[in-house]
Amino acid sequence: MALKLNPFLSQTQKLPSFALPPMASTRSPKFYMASTLKSGSKEVENLKKPFMPPREVHVQVTHSMPPQKIEIFKSLDNWAEENILVHLKPVEKCWQPQDFLPDPASDGFDEQVRELRERAKEIPDDYFVVLVGDMITEEALPTYQTMLNTLDGVRDETGASPTSWAIWTRAWTAEENRHGDLLNKYLYLSGRVDMRQIEKTIQYLIGSGMDPRTENSPYLGFIYTSFQERATFISHGNTARQAKEHGDIKLAQICGTIAADEKRHETAYTKIVEKLFEIDPDGTVLAFADMMRKKISMPAHLMYDGRDDNLFDHFSAVAQRLGVYTAKDYADILEFLVGRWKVDKLTGLSAEGQKAQDYVCRLPPRIRRLEERAQGRAKEAPTMPFSWIFDRQVKL
């Protein structure tokens, strides 16, 4: 990405601190697909264009973790079996999307759908923009499994590896898969959204991938997932609360159930990082500071619908305005993780480790101060058409 991800914005749009700044030049031809055609040819450019991310990604750094540290994760396989796999649920005890939706085999199916659609009529457009954005994020699950399988020392080497790390990744993916399925079916039945535009956005997003800047390092990767799972827990929890306020108890139950899953997954990922702090406090605090200096980018930051190159920024601005996921949440999550991992109490660190410790411990209040200043300078937010809701205008 040509511009650094910057959480401290003072634009006219009230963008949250985790949003990416708009790009002056988008859909750049700097992205190359493997091809037998000659590079630079018009044919190559035409083939590549539909598959390019809507914005540039960072210079890619790979395999930054020293090879000897891979042994740490191999040695933790039994620990992961006993301490991480316990946060998975047996399939037979898991909820399924059908538990919350009209039964298509029931004689009352048509009536159940009518009731769902009547409830959905009472929900405002801006809420649906956020719910659709959350659903699209969940539906890009193939990207997230791919990301986990880039991590050295914990990846699924065969596709059916029996290691605890590989089992976790596959089973976590299987549990998460229900989230997008459930929200997708609800939105389809609601009649409030343009499903074809949503489906295009999902395809674009999966094709674009993501740019978490985790460098194949499980230190960076598990810090990232710890942050993300808590962020999705907060986001789905807030959509549940607001659905209830809008009178749709069933939708509130859907969002709340998904939030509970995210909380359980957050517990697993934060436990992994807690163990890394125990084994390698210096390396782990350096990784924590590294991820926070880069700024945590949301998994769907390359979102695109075929029209709006800054779609993620616009979706994020609506989420910020509604209080679904905000700059304050970003700072609160960081503060929570600092406390959860007892970063302020680490001792015996190197000089660089102490600097990293000081940086992450001081960062939450700094983020809050800068965000307050940005909000104070922000002008009246514009409105924007969203293709997901048939180009109806929504205030950012």
Swiss-Prot record:
Q: What name is this protein filed under?
A: Stearoyl-[acyl-carrier-protein] 9-desaturase, chloroplastic
Tissues where this protein is expressed: Higher levels in developing seeds than in leaf and root tissues.
Disulfide cysteine pairs (residue numbers):
none
Gene Ontology annotations for the cellular component aspect, listed alphabetically:
chloroplast
**Transit peptide interval:** 1-33
Organism source for this protein?
A: Ricinus communis
Pfam families referenced in this protein's UniProt entry, alphabetically: FA_desaturase_2
Which reactions are catalysed by this chain? octadecanoyl-[ACP] + 2 reduced [2Fe-2S]-[ferredoxin] + O2 + 2 H(+) = (9Z)-octadecenoyl-[ACP] + 2 oxidized [2Fe-2S]-[ferredoxin] + 2 H2O
Where is Fe cation 2 bound in this sequence? 176, 229, 262, 265
Q: Which SUPFAM superfamilies match?
A: Ferritin-like
> Major place of localization?
plastid
Q: What residues does Fe cation 1 bind to?
A: 138, 176, 179, 262
Quaternary form? Homodimer.
Q: What does this protein do?
A: Converts stearoyl-ACP to oleoyl-ACP by introduction of a cis double bond between carbons 9 and 10 of the acyl chain.
Family assignment from sequence similarity: Belongs to the fatty acid desaturase type 2 family.
